Curated annotation (Swiss-Prot):
<keyword id="KW-1278">Translocase</keyword>
<dbReference type="GO" id="GO:0016887">
    <property type="term" value="F:ATP hydrolysis activity"/>
</dbReference>
<dbReference type="GO" id="GO:0005524">
    <property type="term" value="F:ATP binding"/>
</dbReference>
<keyword id="KW-1003">Cell membrane</keyword>
<keyword id="KW-0813">Transport</keyword>
<dbReference type="InterPro" id="IPR027417">
    <property type="entry name" value="P-loop_NTPase"/>
</dbReference>
<keyword id="KW-0547">Nucleotide-binding</keyword>
<feature type="domain" description="ABC transporter">
    <location>
        <begin position="30"/>
        <end position="270"/>
    </location>
</feature>
<comment type="similarity">
    <text>Belongs to the ABC transporter superfamily. Lipoprotein translocase (TC 3.A.1.125) family.</text>
</comment>
<dbReference type="InterPro" id="IPR003439">
    <property type="entry name" value="ABC_transporter-like_ATP-bd"/>
</dbReference>
<dbReference type="InterPro" id="IPR017911">
    <property type="entry name" value="MacB-like_ATP-bd"/>
</dbReference>
<comment type="function">
    <text>Part of the ABC transporter complex LolCDE involved in the translocation of mature outer membrane-directed lipoproteins, from the inner membrane to the periplasmic chaperone, LolA. Responsible for the formation of the LolA-lipoprotein complex in an ATP-dependent manner.</text>
</comment>
<protein>
    <recommendedName>
        <fullName>Lipoprotein-releasing system ATP-binding protein LolD</fullName>
        <ecNumber>7.6.2.-</ecNumber>
    </recommendedName>
</protein>
<dbReference type="GO" id="GO:0005886">
    <property type="term" value="C:plasma membrane"/>
</dbReference>
<keyword id="KW-0472">Membrane</keyword>
<dbReference type="InterPro" id="IPR017871">
    <property type="entry name" value="ABC_transporter-like_CS"/>
</dbReference>
<comment type="subunit">
    <text>The complex is composed of two ATP-binding proteins (LolD) and two transmembrane proteins (LolC and LolE).</text>
</comment>
Amino acid sequence: MHRGAATQGLVFTTPLSPFILPFAVDTPLLQVDALLKQYDTGGDEPLTVLRDLDLAVQEGEILAIVGESGTGKSTLLHLLGALDRPTDGTVRFAGTDLFAKSDEELAAFRNRSIGFVFQFHHLLPEFTALENVAMPALIQHRSLADVTPRAHELLALLGLDDRADHRPRTLSGGEKQRVAIARALMNEPALVLMDEPTGNLDARTAEPLHREIERLSREMDHTFVLASHDPSLAEVAGRVLRLEHGTLHPLAAADEMAPEAGPSDDGHAGG
């Protein structure tokens, strides 16, 4: 297989601190209690995006969080994935309080235990599809040669086995998102967070990707949390919650949702 010159013999050597999590059988994979997220806007009062939010996600569950743009879906996923810290409240992963950990420990935790898929894929343009998929393992100071079989396996699983040597500029929008999903699964994470993963695709391109996400959730041992304004994506979930006024409300079925147009939020006060 041809490898891009940018990653010939590439290996990351920066050591990461171990992040060992005890996991009782009856403990939710994710437990969120009284979560508060505010931002300083320079005015008299902070901007409150999430308030008094509680959530439990069981191992193996597929949860959809829906809501209009600007309601804080992306902000919530950033907190669940330890990309940001809350103003108050706790997020426990397998019983362990994430935000009692140092930034270095959280970085190690994220790379090992969380897979992220965002609306905009952020693939590295100078790398091939395979090299982009392998990136989470390379960050864990594994060599490209060692992780190539796993990356090939994931690309094949998503119907991209003939695109391994292609760079992002030669891929369609749907193919790029499949590469992003494969990358999120590279380290076999316990939790996969998907923030508007089909939000920038048209309906014709998005529908097959919805089916792929549903199939992956059935066939692979992962927990999925999907955030979307798109009700058709939420249909793959076993449980649907609406984020409104900074907190979560249950929905009886995905068909209770009205389609909403709009992109993901910017991490401060949106989607």
